Amino acid sequence: MKTVIALSYILCLTFGQDLPGNDNSTATLCLGHHAVPNGTIVKTITDDQIEVTNATELVQSSSTGKICNNPHRILDGRACTLIDALLGDPHCDVFQNETWDLFVERSNAFSNCYPYDIPDYASLRSLVASSGTLEFITEGFTWTGVTQNGGSSACKRGPANGFFSRLNWLTKSESAYPVLNVTMPNNDNFDKLYIWGVHHPSTNQEQTNLYVQASGRVTVSTRRSQQTIIPNIGSRPWVRGQPGRISIYWTIVKPGDVLVINSNGNLIAPRGYFKMRTGKSSIMRSDAPIDTCISECITPNGSIPNDKPFQNVNKITYGACPKYVKQNTLKLATGMRNVPEKQTRGLFGAIAGFIENGWEGMIDGWYGFRHQNSEGTGQAADLKSTQAAIDQINRKLNRVIEKTNEKFHQIEKEFSEVEGRIQDLEKYVEDTKIDLWSYNAELLVALENQHTIDLADSEMNKLFEKTRRQLRENAEDMGNGCFKIYHKCDNACIESIRNGTYDHDIYRDEALNNRFQIKGVELKSGYKDWILWISFAISCLLLCVVLLGFIMWACQRGNIRCNICI
């Protein structure tokens, strides 16, 4: 029994002694990446829910609630529509010769002159809006044998009866209304817009009282077009005390062309022309207030920032705006895959690298080093690899924004009732475009997220391989993102590994010597178990030998008798 105890004691001393390499002749260096306690969930091509350390929202879902007047010139229509300002409604005289980038029509706008209709209202409104100006030049039309400057009680200009300032209502003179034939050439180098009209009396009596003839006719032509309008006499619902109507028409005269007006009654003549300009001006219906601020993108809800590639505030936009999509949120990964640190591990109680988990303590970089040596423990970020990853992700975000921000505007579209099928088709096309863009946006973000995560992992692997190439045979890969360095490596040595100036030849002999010594006697976790089992088996064997020897000795002395029966 004393022999067994003695052998067990010897084995314990053997396996419990300090091993070579447990002293200050080695060090441990781990590589890791940033982690946060609670990451952000994003979508990738392969995974609908993957956690990353950081993500940027790509969808602008709110407006400022006000329209910024810079850098775009905003013209507030207040109580006037653009067409009323164009025609010269008395309460819209303040808009004469105005210019704009965006004309804002309000919901409380109203007409306050003779009731009218425009058969092609939407086209005229869009044409004038895109021109961006109400610059008007009066021309010397000669209307012989008729009375000019007709007025109406429905169109007061002060206390007196008035009319649209840009139109000239012609009526009979001394019971006569001769046939009018007037020409006006365009000798300038720009397009001219002429606005004219036809009066529709409510009764035959009113027709003859104003124009003598029982039925008038108006023909306006150029070399490229001709319009002939016959008045429709008949009573209509009373508007501002008038049962009659005026139909407004328009003609564009190109440079070198000529305008010809022929009529024997019912003509609402032009007083001149509007100078047409080419540009990207527009019009928008909105009740948002106009404020002094700066914004490139305007919607009916108000201005919105254009630092995001997508928005779901409004389909109608003006300026350099994010693309409209249906989604309320699309998150672009701007950080790496998040693997929260195991809190039970402790900082260096069992130091581990990026293969096991991330590090939550790194605030100055995405990638870094942790070490454990004779001088203690430490941590430092690797700024070069961090900056390389950040630069690529920032370029990616800027490319997405640049590709999707529109440098034009999505205008409002209006259709008359007879164009209902066209309106339905237009709506279908717009809805289809939005569906496609929404799908493309989600796919684009998922692809970019996948690439970002792969990129971040790649930078981590590059840093690990760079460190491995530096250390060579002086260290061993521990399989968890760490290296066991087989030579004394103080803080200066660790720093040289981090900054790429480490010279493995200096430490080569020491590392090889320590590696052989440690490998000769080092007990790794797997071998310790085997040796413990072997020592236990030897102890049991020795115990059995001693017990068997005791039995044989006792039998020889006669103290024990053994009977074998067959």
Swiss-Prot record:
Membrane side Extracellular: residue ranges: 17-530
Pfam families documented for this protein: Hemagglutinin
Gene Ontology CC: host cell plasma membrane; membrane; viral envelope; virion membrane
Residue spans, topological domain Cytoplasmic: 552-566
Residues bearing a lipid moiety (S-palmitoyl cysteine): 555, 562, 565
Modified how: Palmitoylated. In natural infection, inactive HA is matured into HA1 and HA2 outside the cell by one or more trypsin-like, arginine-specific endoprotease secreted by the bronchial epithelial cells. One identified protease that may be involved in this process is secreted in lungs by club cells.
Recorded topology in the membrane: Single-pass type I membrane protein
Domain of life: Viruses
Signal keyword on record: yes
GO molecular-function terms, A-Z: host cell surface receptor binding
UniProt-listed HAMAP family: INFV_HEMA
Functional note: Binds to sialic acid-containing receptors on the cell surface, bringing about the attachment of the virus particle to the cell. This attachment induces virion internalization of about two third of the virus particles through clathrin-dependent endocytosis and about one third through a clathrin- and caveolin-independent pathway. Plays a major role in the determination of host range restriction and virulence. Class I viral fusion protein.
UniProt subunit comment: Homotrimer of disulfide-linked HA1-HA2.
The name this protein goes by in its record: Hemagglutinin
Species of origin: Influenza A virus (strain A/Duck/Ukraine/1/1963 H3N8)
Gene (UniProt): HA
